[in-house]
UniProtKB/Swiss-Prot annotation:
Gene3D superfamilies: 3.30.1440.10. It comes from Brucella abortus (strain 2308). The gene is rplE. One of its GO terms (biological process) is translation. The keyword Ribonucleoprotein applies. InterPro entries: Ribosomal_uL5 (IPR002132), Ribosomal_uL5_bac-type (IPR020930), Ribosomal_uL5_C (IPR031309), Ribosomal_uL5_CS (IPR020929), Ribosomal_uL5_dom_sf (IPR022803), Ribosomal_uL5_N (IPR031310). This is Large ribosomal subunit protein uL5. One of its GO terms (molecular function) is rRNA binding.
């Protein structure tokens, strides 16, 4: 008989507590109006890729270890002569997380990775895009426990975008605050 797969901690938190709290706070007419996280996108741009084409592949490996899912190498859409960049050159890596992997990543990000960031004073509460999505940047990818610090030859930054179905920034802010996102006061 197949074992029942354990529900990720953040998904259980969302289903049991956050949905009810948001329904009371914003007084939605329909349960489908309650915001939910649709996806989390991790992006790592590698600026030195123009000089060494192997760097985006290494960044993709690191990103795959962080996300638990294979990363896609991104390529330049058009040529820029001042950056010595040609169309089609590999310049970074990205991963889109959905469903359980997304909740597991957010759990690791908030409970383990963000507290390990040097001089961390909280996330910027103004980094919403006006449509309920939140974007943040991390300067060092070594804050994640999956990355072995001794084997890293170069430290890269990364962008993390949390896409939600919230209609406004205020809805999204209180929604993410319920997940214990450490926003600055």
């Amino acid at each position: 008989m197949a074992e029942a797969k354990a529900l990720p901690r953040f998904k259980k938190l969302y289903q049991d507590n956050i949905r009810k709290a948001l329904l009371e706070e914003f007084k939605y007419d329909n349960e489908m109006q309650i915001p939910r996280i649709t996806k989390v996108v991790l992006n790592m741009g590698v600026g030195e890729a123009t000089g060494d084409s192997k760097k985006p592949a290494v960044a993709a490996e690191d990103l795959a270890m962080i996300a638990g899912q294979k990363a896609v190498v991104t390529r330049a859409r058009n040529s820029i002569a001042t950056f010595k960049l040609r169309e089609g050159m590999p310049i970074g890596a990205k991963v889109t997380l959905r469903q359980d992997r997304m909740y597991e990543f957010l759990d690791r990000l908030i409970t383990i990775a963000l507290p390990r960031v040097r001089d961390f004073r909280g996330l910027n509460p103004k980094s919403f895009d006006g449509r309920g999505n939140y974007a943040m940047g991390i300067k060092e990818h070594i804050v994640f426990p999956e990355i072995n610090y001794d084997k890293v030859d170069q430290i890269w930054g990364m962008d993390i975008i949390v896409c939600t179905t919230a209609k406004t920034d205020d809805e999204a802010r209180s929604f993410l605050r319920a997940f214990n996102f450490p926003f600055r006061q």
